[in-house]
Amino acid sequence: MVKEKKPLKGKIPSRRKFFKTAAATGAAATAAVAMPNLALGGGHTTLKMQAAWPSGANIFFEMAGDYAKMVDQMSGGTLKIDLQPVGAVVKTSEIGQAVSSGVLDMGHWVTAYWYGKNPAASLFGTGPSYGMSSQEVMGWMEYGGGRALYEETLAKVGFDYVGFFHMPMPAQPFGWFKKNVTKVSDVKGMKYRTVGLATNVLTAMGMVVRQLPGGEIQPAMKTGLIDAAEFNNPTSDSQFGMQDVSKHYHLGSFHQSQEMFEIPINKKSYNNLSPAHQAILKNAAYAANTDNYFKALVRYSADLSKFCLLYTSPSPRDS
């Protein structure tokens, strides 16, 4: 976390002015101790955030940027987020620990990326389907007891951060396949990329599951390391170029019907902020929650229509 302050301007003060200035500075310093993020001289605080997404044409990085912009606007420029793409400081899998240790002030990823540390992570993003939608999960998180369980899980994992959530994602497609799948037996032995709770379920169904970062999925399909893959949605998938390596895009699936972004914030950095700035970080997540969801509904549909030439409804007799 970086605090900046503007240099003092003007002439060298007289002795009388010096003592008056010193007294005023002492009072200001006392106030600054009470509210440490109010940088002296009208400056601002900058928090370093790394996302799990590449920069450029990537809708998830764009959404992380939307959140950062809202924080800047809500604070009147006194609180800024220095957003960095994946790999700028650490790997995707290292974001949680980097935020906890203070290497980063903030992160932008999903809880499925720390599922390997504790399967309970799936409850906050890739949990069992046929229940709550992603919007309902976020309601449970804030008003149904989910946050207490989330914070308990963070402590067990060893993550030392405060977390907020935004962007309730629509149910995700089953993904891209090199061959058309019409029955359950078609997926047996298939090398498939996914994350979270789905890794266990699909392994039990006979698939060979690979957990790969988003940027490695398309090259892995191209070289044959995997036969099929899911990432998230038509927009992000097309930005990775998945339509260039597969012509079969299966939509409805069970595996991720309730995911959302997690924004981890280093506890020390968070506690050093004023209550007003803490509230901005939280409420900007709520604002981005609505804005990003509206954006997704339009963008995902538009991008799906660009490469979907033929839609076939599955038969209820398929098994």
Predicted stretch roles:
Residues 2, 10-137, 149-313, 317-319:
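N-terminal secretory/targeting leader peptides
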